[in-house]
Amino acid sequence: MAVRIKLKPGREKSLERRHPWVFSNGIHNVKGKLEAGDTVDVVAHDGHWLGRGAWSPESQIQVRIWTFDREEEIDREFFKRRILRAQAGRDDLIREQGLTGYRLIAAESDGLPGITIDKYANVLVCQLLSMGADVWRDTIVDVLAELYPDCAIYERSDVDSRKKEGLASTMGLLHGTLPEMPVIIEENGIKIAVDVTKGHKTGFYLDQRDNRAMAARFVKGKSVLNCFCYTGTFGLYAAKAGAASIENVDVSALALDTARLNMRVNGLNDDNVHYNEADVFKLLRQYRDEGKTFDVIVLDPPKFADNKSQLNGACRGYKDINMIALQLLNPGGVLLTFSCSGLMPADLFQKIVADAALDAKREIQFIERLSQASDHPIGSAFPEGFYLKGLVARVW
């Protein structure tokens, strides 16, 4: 008999709606002997079968569901089917946008909880963030090596969230030969340098691809301030679209060096591009005090809230930085502002920016609501997959 976890009365509703998480406070009892990462069946209090997932005793999320199909076994073929399905769902996008860099597996939203896989040219980068994912590492690598024989496989599980699973951070080569860094990927006809060993996340922010392309609509002949620019790709799109001037701002000198490289690999002259190694919060206040203005400002800050207790502080931070940015925009200018925190509801983020406009004494119109690129899908039963929120505002 399979090891079985029984839920408390009434705690089956989320699984019946196919949400893939079982929290520790919803478990009534465990029947059978379990080790971390083991596959376990989950049943309702009345005994009816709900799903099959991975056991993670040290996490608040103690089971992540692999499948809601009682006949589906969790084995090598299971992972192969999931990866093939995810690839098929991205093939049209890859052809349309000429992508050599994209998210192959978006964790729960692709039916593989705790597993993120990004493809950068001939390198696959994995993040294994749950106990179940960690236990199946060798199988996942074996399947990837079969399906993508020309790719090196590199792990970037160097994230704090693994601690919640009782796992140590880890990174390194899992298969093949890693090419010299950076690798060059392409999107929408633009080349981008990515260092998968040192870059943020798995190396780059693939989720902003569509927003980079959209932002280019507003920049021809305009002055652009690109805040928290990382490797400068919003500025790169702006340069190609004919911006009059671009200022890329980031606290990392290494990121700015890559921003310069990105201009070179695209054959673009950067005489009108300024690279500013600075704290964005301090710089915006300095520019406001100096009376400096811009036509377009991009605000793409790091995550302000990792848990619910930090949300109020995040709201204050978003309001403050958006207020100052609005004060720096010329009449008719455009603000592109983002939140990458999954805890920040889209409607609340819009209200924060609206309140910032009141404090800045500026009139704004919201002309676009933005999200993550379509290779970062949002499972219908997993609203937590909707993490990137963006707004485009015309400012008067």
Curated annotation (Swiss-Prot):
The protein's matches in Pfam families, at most eight in alphabetical order, are given as: Methyltrans_SAM, PUA_3
> In which compartments does the protein localize?
Cytoplasm
E.C. designation(s):
2.1.1.191
Which domain of life does the UniProt lineage start with? Answer: Bacteria
Instruction: Give me the disulphide-bonded residues.
Output: none
Q: What is its main location?
A: cytoplasm
GO CC list: cytoplasm
The molecular function terms of the Gene Ontology recorded here are: RNA binding; rRNA (cytosine) methyltransferase activity
Name the job this protein performs: Specifically methylates the cytosine at position 1962 (m5C1962) of 23S rRNA.
What is the recorded name of this protein? Ribosomal RNA large subunit methyltransferase I
